[in-house]
């Protein structure tokens, strides 16, 4: 059985064997890609805190994740909640565009071979994954472990960029955001794992049009054979992994905004990610969508106490 830090073990093992290669830890507390107050009833009276919970989530992940001595980069993220606007089908498009450029500039300056990204909502995978796709000349497959496929587009009902993250990695989406990305990942090299809520029929249709398979949580409940089989035929030697914490079963832990029932167990996710790492070289790992609901409420309580407020 893998320990709780199992999803980190592949990085340290490969660091031992590939000392000349460089891993960076990218702290990316982007929240602008989401508008989620309706899904957080305990924060219904404070939509700003609901969205900025992603900012705190990234800080918490950074605190909790093992420190293996990698260089740490922190993307500067605005916390200004005033006048959130939808531009060309994307909420807070201009802030996201600016922050995407900053993240890419930092990665190009650091020139890492592998990237651990701690977010932040799901769109934090877009820049590091496309950076890696460019670095390895397309020799990269993408596995998206999530409760939702994140295949929406500008003009769909929901304008949150975090729901467009997988499509953006493939080069589809709002033209200015896509124009700054250094590469795209071909849909033939994309696998969804654990999807259990498509939200709207057109999203499922879009997935079918792109030809992207989904391996359900039930299919990997006992082993990762279905994922291994896909990896052996994907045509890439390297892989990037997106781990949205809402894939986890809320009956075991509520770690994210999404609480769709019948998710994957923590030990299953840990085993799947380690099995992927045993099959291919993992060059990117994102942990995203941490929403520390209790910590947010404690923070709000502290803000109202004497000598603290």
Regions found by a protein language model. Give the residues of each.
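Short, structured patches in soluble enzyme cores that scaffold and shape functional sites
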Residues: 144-147, 170, 192-197, 216-218, ...
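Short, glycine/acidic-enriched loop or turn micro-motifs at the edges of active sites
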Residues: 147-151, 197, 245-247, 292
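N-terminal amphipathic/basic-hydrophobic helices that include classical n-h-c signal peptides
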Residues: 1-17
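Short, well-ordered beta-to-alpha junction loops that form the rim of enzyme active sites
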Residues: 29, 119-122, 147, 195, ...
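Catalytic cores of soluble, metal-dependent hydrolases
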Residues: 19-116, 128-137, 209-309
